[in-house]
């Protein structure tokens, strides 16, 4: 039993199939079945307005114009071979850029480890004030304060707290 009022007929002249879930073309605004809804499937006369692709180069992030009828993958490949400004061997970013400020130490770290007292940049081995002979914390005013009053003024971070605990157990 057919329901002629339910659904719509495909607008493709060679099909005219009654489709219960028709798809409307966003370019020509006609209804099509699942086989003819693509621009190529029904030879849409307004496809040039909608079927535009501008791929982006995965290396240099530049938009690459693609002419009508060209395959985007081929155009991107040609761009990467000829016109791409990114050269993997030349533009390599350094990872270990933060050099230790301790005299005689030449280590470099990925992350900046700044001393809270003298604000110098140090490697993991010299990151604590006692390890790099910190000059900012050696004033007479800072020596006069007790360790409990220092802890009350500023709450130590988890890393520094753990380091202090480990130093106490090692000594």
Swiss-Prot record:
Keyword Cytoplasm: yes
Gene3D superfamilies: AN1-like Zinc finger (4.10.1110.10)
Residue numbers binding Zn(2+) 2: 25, 28, 42, 44
SMART domains given in the database record: ZnF_AN1
Keyword hit for DNA damage: no
Region of interest (Disordered), ranges: 134-171
Binding site for Zn(2+) 4: 115, 118, 132, 134
Zn finger intervals (AN1-type): 4-52, 94-142
Disulfide bonds: none
Top-rank taxon, per record: Eukaryota
Pfam families (UniProt xref): zf-AN1, zf-C2H2_ZFAND2
GO biological process: cellular response to arsenic-containing substance; positive regulation of proteasomal ubiquitin-dependent protein catabolic process
Gene Ontology cellular component terms for the protein in this record: cytoplasm; nucleus; proteasome complex
Localization per Swiss-Prot or TrEMBL: Cytoplasm; Nucleus
Molecular function (Gene Ontology), one example: zinc ion binding
Residues given in the record as Zn(2+) 3 binding sites: 100, 105, 123, 126
PANTHER family tied to this protein: AN1-TYPE ZINC FINGER PROTEIN 2A (PTHR14677:SF11), ARSENITE INDUCUBLE RNA ASSOCIATED PROTEIN AIP-1-RELATED (PTHR14677)
Protein name, per record: AN1-type zinc finger protein 2A
Encoding gene (name): Zfand2a
């Amino acid at each position: 039993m057919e329901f002629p009022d339910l659904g719509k007929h495909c607008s493709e002249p060679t099909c005219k199939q009654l489709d219960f879930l028709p798809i409307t073309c966003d370019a020509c605004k006609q209804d099509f079945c699942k086989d003819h809804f693509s621009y190529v499937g029904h030879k849409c006369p307004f496809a040039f307005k909608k079927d535009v692709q501008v791929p982006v180069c995965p290396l240099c992030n530049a938009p690459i114009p693609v002419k009508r009828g060209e395959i985007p993958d081929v155009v991107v490949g040609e761009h990467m071979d000829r016109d791409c400004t990114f050269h993997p061997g030349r533009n390599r970013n350094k990872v270990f850029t933060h050099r230790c400020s301790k005299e005689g130490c030449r280590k470099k770290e990925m992350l900046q480890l700044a001393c809270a007292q003298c604000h110098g940049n140090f490697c993991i081995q010299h990151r604590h004030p006692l390890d790099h002979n910190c000059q900012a914390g050696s004033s007479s005013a800072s020596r006069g304060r007790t360790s409990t009053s220092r802890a009350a003024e500023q709450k130590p971070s988890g890393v520094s707290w753990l380091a202090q605990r480990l130093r106490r157990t090692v000594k």
